[in-house]
Regions:
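Extended, non-transmembrane interaction/recognition domains
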Residues: 1-116, 120
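Short secondary-structure junctions and interdomain/linker hinges
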Residues: 87-96, 111-112, 136, 158, ...
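A broad "ordered helical/assembly scaffold" signature
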Residues: 101-104, 113-129, 154, 160-162
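Short, charged cytosolic
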Residues: 124-150
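Transmembrane alpha-helical segments and their cytosolic interface motifs
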Residues: 143-173
Length: 173
């Protein structure tokens, strides 16, 4: 719902499926699993993406629209991309988190490739999200106060109406 991976019907996997801890060095699958984890992380961070042959292509719609194309064979591991993916899809609203992450990434990747994202980008994403939450809490508290005031007014009017009705019954007896 937060991203569209065109090849998902062919590759029904998530980055988490390849995030496996391998306990010994020189395991031939380590590099392959890291590469797959990274490619899928990029795919699920993006607004839309697809794998065509040996290329991963995608679009990130944020503050600016950014298109990227990565050669699958030459891609280097970047653990920050998985951390961003994991942050988006763990807890909270993935749509809100994806929008914030894409805004920051689209601005940052004006100067570097998406595969070169670093910890500063992740920190910026989290900082922007915290500001977003702070604004939402403020809006929530304002709305809660308005609802409480509305309920208080309704209860008061209901009490006045009940008293008026009781007085009319007394006068009719």
């Amino acid at each position: 719902e937060a991203s569209y991976f065109y090849n998902f019907d062919t590759y029904e996997v998530l980055p988490d499926d390849f995030k496996i801890t391998i306990n010994y060095e020189s395991n031939p699958l380590t590099e392959l699993f890291q590469k797959i984890t990274m490619l899928l992380s990029i795919s699920f961070i993006a607004t839309s993406s697809s794998i065509n042959g040996r290329q991963l292509k995608g679009i990130i719609n944020g503050q600016r629209t950014m298109e990227y194309c990565c050669d699958i064979n030459n891609i280097q591991d970047n653990k920050v991309l998985y951390r961003i993916y994991n942050w988006i899809y763990t807890d909270g609203s993935p749509i809100d988190k994806a929008i914030i992450a894409r805004n920051v990434i689209s601005l940052h990747c004006k100067y570097v490739s998406i595969t070169e994202i670093d910890d500063k980008v992740m920190a910026s994403i989290q900082s922007n999200y915290n500001l977003y939450l702070k604004d939402n809490v403020k809006d929530y508290l304002e709305l809660k106060n308005k609802v409480a005031e509305f309920i208080s007014d309704i209860v008061s009017k209901t009490g006045e109406y009940a008293t008026s009705l009781l007085d009319k019954f007394k006068s009719n007896l």
